[in-house]
Amino acid sequence: MISKNFFIESVNKTAIASAFSRAAHSYEQAASLQKEVGFRLLQMTGDIKKSWVLDAGCGTGYFSQFWRQKGNRVLSLDLSFEMLKKAKKKSAAQAYLLADIEHLPILDQKIDLCFSNMAIQWCDDLKVVLAEFHRVTRSGGVILFSTLAMGSLKELAQAWQKVDEEPHINRFLSFEEIQQICTPYHSELKMCLSKVCFPDLRSLIQSLRGVGATHLHRGRKVGLSSRARIQKLENAYPVKFGEYPLSYQLVYGIIYRD
């Protein structure tokens, strides 16, 4: 199943992997939104048993473990070594791969179900990601993915704009762009808005740190700054009813492999 011709190294991906590795110890407790999104994603398909499931961007293996307990054979893949260590410690899968979703070291048509929850927004090119998922999935198989679309983290982005002119939030594709990329495939997409409210800015920032979502593609870290700048950010934040809201434009997708 595993291809021998595998090589991937990039500064961006190394930095992303490091951010998630630093969060490996806190991820399981902090990833409430990721778990909620993952279970909604599962509702898009019925039970799949006695199949090879690829959990692409598995994190600490929460959903790998779910698939394995359903009787599937699971391959857990992540860019972060520390995340994979956590997954392996709980025996979440039968096999583990430290690899990049955009360069899957897997032979063609070896996977029955490709599952990727809240991971592909960290990739360089969604076209490449979906092409790789399609390549490794067998005819008759299914690809399930969730990701973030434009408008996610908008409150944090708007607050930072009032502090300085530097980008502090990664750009997300619009829903229309994601639809266009999925056009070559037999696919179904839906988007819904989810808002998470925090009692203070510190809790909000900590929630991002807790799941490793602090890497900015241009080389800075999201939301990390001096105390004075954080105070300015807090003053600029659009507080509603005493709470700090954070929006997520969630996209759920299913691709049927012909």
Swiss-Prot record:
Gene3D superfamilies this protein is in?
Vaccinia Virus protein VP39
One GO BP annotation is: methylation
Q: In which pathway does it act?
A: Cofactor biosynthesis; biotin biosynthesis
Q: Which of the seven top EC classes does this enzyme belong to? A: transferase
Q: Which Pfam family is one of this chain's hits?
A: Methyltransf_11
| UniProt KW keywords | Biotin biosynthesis, Methyltransferase, S-adenosyl-L-methionine, Transferase
| EC number from the UniProt entry | 2.1.1.197
UniProt key word Membrane: no
Task: Look up keyword Lyase and say if it applies.
Answer: no
What reaction(s) does this enzyme catalyze?
malonyl-[ACP] + S-adenosyl-L-methionine = malonyl-[ACP] methyl ester + S-adenosyl-L-homocysteine
CDD domains cross-referenced by the UniProt entry: AdoMet_MTases (cd02440)
Name the cystine pairs: none
The GO molecular function terms of this record are: carboxyl-O-methyltransferase activity; malonyl-CoA methyltransferase activity; S-adenosylmethionine-dependent methyltransferase activity
Q: Which PANTHER family does the record cross-reference, listed alphabetically?
A: ARGININE-HYDROXYLASE NDUFAF5, MITOCHONDRIAL
Q: Which family does it belong to?
A: Belongs to the methyltransferase superfamily.
Known role: Converts the free carboxyl group of a malonyl-thioester to its methyl ester by transfer of a methyl group from S-adenosyl-L-methionine (SAM). It allows to synthesize pimeloyl-ACP via the fatty acid synthetic pathway.
Q: Which HAMAP family match?
A: BioC (MF_00835)
> What protein is this chain from?
Malonyl-[acyl-carrier protein] O-methyltransferase
Which organism encodes this protein? Hamiltonella defensa subsp. Acyrthosiphon pisum (strain 5AT)
Q: What does the record give as the organism's lineage?
A: Bacteria, Pseudomonadati, Pseudomonadota, Gammaproteobacteria, Enterobacterales
